[in-house]
UniProtKB/Swiss-Prot annotation:
Catalyzes the reversible cyclization of carbamoyl aspartate to dihydroorotate. Signal peptide: none annotated. This is Dihydroorotase. The gene is pyrC. The lineage of its organism: Bacteria, Pseudomonadati, Pseudomonadota, Gammaproteobacteria, Enterobacterales. Substrate binds at residues 19-21, 45, 140, 223, 255, 267. It comes from Yersinia pseudotuberculosis serotype IB (strain PB1/+). One of its GO terms (molecular function) is dihydroorotase activity. Binds 2 Zn(2+) ions per subunit. Belongs to the metallo-dependent hydrolases superfamily. DHOase family. Class II DHOase subfamily.
Length: 348
């Protein structure tokens, strides 16, 4: 029997999907990311979405101002696609190095997506330009038709929206974000180098039974919602396969405690504090630690055409206890796996 490794050294990872929010929430949650991750793709769905070069630059400056001393962190900004976005604004932002990618939210699919796109074929000219200049398209892959069951919205999105986009724009780089189903995993595995996907720790570790059996656990509620066990197992198999089309994207999405624990709670899991130990635990369970570094630190840069990070992080087999809550002014944020212990810690 092979001895269990006691340390893991990997290239410093990047987070290819995160919500950093703004103001006090930003300054509270950012250090948990900037301490471990070198770069992060920052979602643009603020209450006032990031749709212009100027607003992206201003938001980037607010993020950089909140990075603690001693942390080396680069936020990678994204443009929020709307029905009326000017193609020149998108192109200018990408060519100036302000926008790394553009984000497609179907209108009302998730938090702060009311400004999202209601008629996707109408913005095909944006996709055509993005394909031409090599700008990645990041997609929240769920249909929003009220007649479609919430557990079926990702699978339906593939057939109705994603496949037509890929057929029309075959060389458009697309990230199918936070995938949650066997349908999505199989679709990405069957794809080509222009299609990638991010996978969150919560969708690898849990399924809908964990959220709903024996009481509702609101801190596991996110969108896309956790699916049945068969889908969870398919995601685990996909990341364990070593395919270079899957990479780390936490979708860490903090909300104040009272906004999660309510009669109509917000969707989002704040997993940044435990993200890397959580992924390591999953890969170890799957006997796939040999693929951890690629998933966390190599596949994403390769897809985006960016250099890998020079420095390394070290994970050590030391119990890591997640706090029950994290102060947020007069309130608090409940982290993913609150009060639980993971087998791996990031060496500081």
């Amino acid at each position: 029997m092979t001895a269990q490794p006691q340390t893991l050294k990997i290239r410093r990872p990047d987070d290819w999907h995160i919500h950093l929010r703004d103001d006090e929430m930003l300054s509270t949650v950012l250090p948990y990311t900037s301490e471990v991750f070198a770069r992060a793709i920052v979602m643009p769905n603020l209450a006032q979405p990031i749709t212009t070069v100027a607003s992206a630059i201003a938001y980037r400056e607010r993020i950089l101002a909140a990075v603690p001393a001693g942390h080396k962190f680069t936020p990678l900004m994204t443009c929020y696609l709307t029905n009326s976005l000017d193609v020149k604004e998108l192109t200018t932002g990408f060519e100036q190095g302000v926008f790394t990618a553009a984000k497609l939210y179907p209108a009302n699919a998730t938090t702060n997506s009311t400004h999202g796109v209601s008629d996707i074929p109408a913005i095909y000219p944006l996709f055509e330009q993005m394909q031409k200049i090599g700008m990645p398209l990041l997609i929240h892959g769920e249909v929003t038709d009220a007649a479609v069951d919430i557990f079926d919205r990702e699978a339906r999105f593939i057939d109705q929206i994603l496949e037509p986009i890929r057929q029309k724009f075959p060389e458009l780089k697309i990230v199918f974000e936070h995938i949650t189903t066997k349908d999505a995993a199989d679709y990405v595995l069957a794809g080509n180098r222009f299609l990638g996907a991010t996978v969150t720790p919560q969708h690898l570790m849990f399924n809908r039974n964990h959220m709903l059996v024996g009481g509702i656990r609101p801190h596991l509620f996110c969108l896309p919602i956790l699916k049945r066990s068969t889908h969870q197992q398919a995601l685990r198999a996909a990341v364990a396969s070593g395919s270079d089309r899957f990479f780390l994207g936490t979708d860490s999405a903090p909300h104040a405690k009272h906004r999660k624990e309510s009669s109509c709670g917000c969707a989002g899991v704040f997993n940044a504090p435990a993200a890397l130990p959580a992924y390591a635990s999953v890969f170890e369970e799957l006997n796939a630690l040999q693929h951890l570094e690629a998933f966390c630190a190599l596949n994403g840069p390769r897809f985006y055409g960016l250099p890998v990070n020079d420095d390394v992080v070290e994970l050590v087999r030391t119990p890591f206890l997640q706090p029950e809550e994290i102060p947020l002014g007069n309130e608090s944020v409940i982290p993913f796996l609150a009060g639980q212990t993971l087998n791996w810690s990031v060496k500081r």
